[in-house]
Amino acid sequence: MQKEIAIPLAYFITFTCYGTWLHGGKITSVDKQHNIPGTEFVLADANREASAKKRLVEAPYLLDHAQRHIVLDAIKEACTFRAWILLAAHIRTNHIHLVVHATVSPESIMNTIKSYASRRLNESKLDSNRLKRWTRHGSTRYLWKEEDVEVTIQYVIHEQGDPMAIFENKSRESFAGAVIAP
């Protein structure tokens, strides 16, 4: 007998640009000891942050206006090609937020998105000498309830400061159909 695997309504995926969001810095972060929703983040620690900075192999990576739009287009391309439903995306200067419905793992989505974005950035020749653009992993949250999906989309689109490169799927019909399909 085959075991049914529960698929969440969507995933909330966040990843940062290389060297911009270091453990111990003033910006909150998670690590292996601080990764349970609702618990404390990594505390600010100047020594830990300085140690992380020393380990960087190149300068921190920031996305300018043109690069953010290249990344957004690459994300839409990847989602279309893989038949994933992109519900929301916000490409910031130093991090990316996505809300995606898919039947694969959020880690697979994140890795694919990073690959597509890097490929398109390489083709643009805006920063082709970079070795590293993205942090090694990121945050992957499972959204099981419609309310959680809507709240997360609101956060991604409207609660990040001034809009940068954004996408919001206004049509939830395609999403609803995908959710109830076997």
Feature names for model-found ranges:
Residues M1-P182:
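Short catalytic/metal-binding and nucleic-acid-binding patches
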